Curated annotation (Swiss-Prot):
Topological category with respect to the lipid bilayer: Single-pass membrane protein
GO CC aspect terms: membrane
Organism: Amanita muscaria (strain Koide BX008)
Paired cysteines (S-S): none
Entry annotated with the keyword Heme: yes
Induction note: Expression is highly induced during artificial growth in symbiosis with Populus, which is close to its natural condition.
Protein name: Cytochrome P450 monooxygenase iboC
Length: 561
């Protein structure tokens, strides 16, 4: 070996040693320089696990006071990010949806749903085509097609509430299930064998994503244990087969009516006709239809339960709704969808129910698909992100000092109309008086301009526009491409249910069996089932509001049958 070649060899050897060492040092320095969002200190291995209760939205909201709008946690090695302000939530989940629109993997849910249950599906080709197909039959432009069905079911629900003195939650659940079943499958649920199978699967799927439901979520190697040894895997696989058979059977019944030309507008019928257009397999179309039943029934039941609770806890709000109905509809006919635009306080009541008591207060989970930086903080790939809906919907800086209370009047402008709102959904723009956002004195010009309010910083908006112009709505339907597909249909159902019940009935607290006095509920109390919040009671006394109410209700039902 010559001196020159020997020197070259040593230089190459030195480079081979130094370059990796420098890279490791650089990577370590980079990690040190990464500034993670603030958050409470945890303990080794478990992190912040033991700092959370069965109501994590309460701890998340408390963290906001100490750490600010972003809170970073670690749960057994899994990074969590909590967003506690509208600005942070919309910045990340709306504007940066490409990074934050995925869902974290749930091993149990994967076996249970085969990746076909849209709310839990990972971002990818299957999720995308299911989402597009669902949107085609649930967007705002087609929601009106289902209003006849919703009107009939609202009349039936009002009738049952008047006839039966107890079992309110059961009545609300059966009504929601019947209405959505009719919309999806063009036939009301008979309460037969389909009903318990749907409810059983709903319970199973909610458990599947509940923390600590199975050790497999924290010990991924357990997924490779044979099903005959792993009871959780066996039950999940059986659940997938049973629910698939159920949904395929329901879809087949609709297909027969479509072939015979004997069907009315329905989501399943539309999916059958356009299945090839959307690239869906029969199993995917069946699961998409079944998903609509599961999600729609539970969320509608919860909203209706909170409606009854609010009406007995805040009787003055009930009376104001009824006064508006008397002024607009009168007492000679039932309210219809034709009255919707003329009932601003009733519509504000819907918005306030959804704001005041969101069904999932902690928000649906999002998942980062790559590293990101926000406001100087590093958010690593693989972080589970929660938009803390409870904190967002109860922010006193936006909704006022009474944000914890039920008050539809916060959405009524000085002229008595429904205020335009920072969208409760992600739909389009709102017409607002045109002026420069930096000029708070330019409200006189009559020119109107469309502004996408979703992407305006809410605190900036509130400081520039008076409350009579707009008040933010709610974020209970979610964010970005993960926003609830059926929100327009849900809003229609709530409107006609609220209107029918309040027009025909008076709602008052149930009598306490021990004291003989009305059992008025605590205005701020609630219970929780897993990550859902429910009223402490739905029992109440429902009576005809005036002498002719039951007769007009019966006549209207007969005409609609």
């Amino acid at each position: 070996m010559t001196l020159q070649s020997e020197s070259r060899f040593y230089y190459q050897l030195l480079a081979a040693v130094l370059i990796p060492a420098l890279f490791v040092a650089w990577a370590a320095r980079l990690r040190q320089n990464r500034k993670y969002p603030p958050g409470p200190k945890g303990i080794p291995i478990f992190g912040n696990l033991f700092q959370l209760s069965t109501r994590p939205w309460i701890e998340f909201s408390a963290f906001k006071e100490q750490y600010g709008p972003l809170v970073y946690l670690n749960i057994v090695g899994q990074p969590l990010l909590i967003t506690n302000t509208h600005t942070a939530a919309t910045d990340l989940f709306d504007r940066r949806g490409g990074v934050y629109s995925d869902r974290p993997r749930s091993i149990v849910a994967d076996y249970l749903t085969g990746g076909l249950y849209l709310p839990f599906a990972r971002h990818g080709p299957t999720w995308l085509k299911l989402r597009r197909a669902g949107h085609a039959f649930m967007h705002k432009g087609v929601a009106h097609k289902y209003r006849d069905t919703q009107f009939k079911e609202a009349l039936t629900l009002t009738h049952h509430l008047l006839q039966s003195p107890s079992g309110r939650r059961r009545q609300l659940f059966e009504s929601a299930e019947a209405s959505i079943h009719s919309i999806v499958y063009d036939q009301p649920s008979s309460g037969g064998p389909v009903y318990p199978k749907m409810t059983d699967f709903s319970t199973l799927i909610n458990k599947a994503v509940t923390p600590l439901f199975t050790p497999a979520e924290f010990l991924p190697l357990m997924q490779y244990v044979p099903s005959w040894l792993a009871g959780w895997k066996r039950r999940a696989q059986q659940g997938f087969v049973l629910f698939s058979e159920l949904c395929e059977g329901l879809l087949e019944e609709v297909a027969k009516r479509v072939d015979a030309g004997d069907d009315r507008p329905s989501m399943a019928g539309g999916l059958i006709r356009e299945r090839e257009k959307h690239g869906l397999t029969n199993l995917e179309a069946a699961w998409l239809s079944g998903m609509m039943i599961l999600v729609g029934t539970e969320t509608n039941t919860l909203a209706m339960s909170w409606f009854l609770y609010a009406m007995i806890a805040y009787p003055d709000k009930q009376k104001r709704c009824q006064a508006e109905l008397d002024a607009v509809v009168g007492r000679s006919r039932m309210p219809t969808f034709e009255d919707l635009e003329k009932l601003p306080y009733l519509r504000a009541t819907i918005r306030e129910i959804l704001r005041w008591r969101p069904s999932i207060p902690v928000g649906a989970r999002h998942y980062t698909t790559k590293d990101d930086w926000y406001q100087g903080y590093f958010i690593p790939k693989g972080t589970i992100c929660f938009p803390n809906v409870w904190s967002l919907n109860h922010d006193p800086a936006i909704y006022g000092t009474d944000a914890d209370h039920f008050n539809p009047g916060r959405f009524i402008d000085k002229d008595g109309g429904l205020s335009p709102a920072i969208p409760a959904t992600k739909d389009g723009a709102f017409l607002i008086p045109h002026h420069d956002l930096h000029n708070s004195h330019g409200l006189n010009p009559p020119k109107m301009q469309k502004v996408c309010l979703r992407f305006i910083d809410l605190h900036t908006f509130r400081s520039k526009y008076p409350l009579s112009i707009a008040v933010p709505g709610h974020v209970s339907y979610g964010f970005g491409s993960r926003i609830c597909l059926g929100r327009h249909i849900a809003n229609d159902a709530l409107f006609i249910n609220f209107a029918s019940i309040l027009w025909a009935t008076s709602i008052s607290p149930a009598m306490n069996a021990n004291t003989g006095k009305p059992d008025v509920p605590d205005k701020l109390a609630y219970s929780n089932l897993g990550l859902l919040i429910v009223p402490t009671t739905t029992e109440c006394v429902i009576q005809p509001r005036f002498d002719e109410a039951e007769g007009i209700l019966a006549q209207t039902r007969e005409l609609c049958m």
